[in-house]
Amino acid sequence: MDLVRQLNDRLLFAVPKKGRLYEKSVALLNGADILFHRSHRLDIALSTSTPVALIFLPAADIPTFVGEGRCDLGITGVDQVRESGVNVELLQDLDFGRCQLQVQVPAGGPYSQPEQLIGKTIVTSFTRLAREYFARLEGVDEAAMTTRVKYVGGSVEAACALGVADAIVDLVESGETMRAAGLTPIGTVLSTSAHLICSPNPKSSLALLDTVRARIEGVLAAQHYVYCTYNAHADALPALLRITPGRRAPTISKLDDDNWYAVSSMIIRREKGRILDDLKASGAEDIMVFEISNCRV
């Protein structure tokens, strides 16, 4: 009862309780300084650094808890949001958990286009999305479609080999599992990734919601950028600033030598190698790059 009473004044944040989404979500929360200790026997953890309570749930249940206002925020995949049919706000793409919800058929079999599966049997754990997809292919309402969609909760990739289905609809990340099962993709139902979602009727204060969102955005921005500094002669400065314009503008400081300047700028992480090469070729000296652990942009 003490734990339940402590939830009253906290923002309730639904987080996947296991798997890769759990691991990535916890790393994101730690980066945002939403620190907590979770007992192995409990699916609720109180943050020790912020007025937030973390509620650990199956990823498929999170849209319902958030959509009905039982939790204020949540982390789950767009696939789970669309499958649930619940009204939630997609606040932020978290840039992990990227995969495709694909139509897969036995490799070398008679099917090469999803239209060839009209009237056949499809097995999936995403029945809502599969029905919508095949109803569009047939050009009819779901009630009138001839394609049969059956629910299976796990090991969907085995359905074709066991003769349960002509095709499956399942999430695919690298495709290795499907290839090992002798399956090949012939259509994509949905591209998905983990998102920060918000209830349409949050009970927590808007100020706290905005603070948590800003912290998470800061962690994501820090993952995309690094901090670059270098020294530049006045003659080379204009060309160098074109290479490192910064998010808004670079920071330029005059050195004791009248002809030299120190320049600092955020640069895109994935372009770091090219930018450093260009800086060196254009006359920059003493070039250094630093990691950014967090920021507000």
Swiss-Prot record:
GO CC, alphabetical: cytoplasm
InterPro entries: ATP-PRT_HisG_long, ATP_PRibTrfase_cat, ATP_PRibTrfase_CS, ATP_PRibTrfase_HisG, HisG_C, N-reg_PII-like_a/b, N-reg_PII/ATP_PRibTrfase_C
Pathway per the UniProt entry: Amino-acid biosynthesis; L-histidine biosynthesis; L-histidine from 5-phospho-alpha-D-ribose 1-diphosphate: step 1/9
Coiled-coil zones: none
GO biological process: L-histidine biosynthetic process
A GO MF term: ATP binding
Record localization: Cytoplasm
Primary residence: cytoplasm
Group of enzyme by EC: transferase
Keywords: Amino-acid biosynthesis, ATP-binding, Cytoplasm, Glycosyltransferase, Histidine biosynthesis, Nucleotide-binding, Transferase
Acyltransferase as UniProt keyword: no
Membrane spanning residue stretches: none
EC number of the protein: 2.4.2.17
Pfam family, one: HisG
Catalytic activity: 1-(5-phospho-beta-D-ribosyl)-ATP + diphosphate = 5-phospho-alpha-D-ribose 1-diphosphate + ATP
Protein's job: Catalyzes the condensation of ATP and 5-phosphoribose 1-diphosphate to form N'-(5'-phosphoribosyl)-ATP (PR-ATP). Has a crucial role in the pathway because the rate of histidine biosynthesis seems to be controlled primarily by regulation of the enzymatic activity.
Family statement: Belongs to the ATP phosphoribosyltransferase family.
NCBIfam families: hisG (TIGR00070), HisG_C-term (TIGR03455)
Name recorded for this polypeptide: ATP phosphoribosyltransferase
UniProt source species: Eremothecium gossypii (strain ATCC 10895 / CBS 109.51 / FGSC 9923 / NRRL Y-1056) (Yeast)
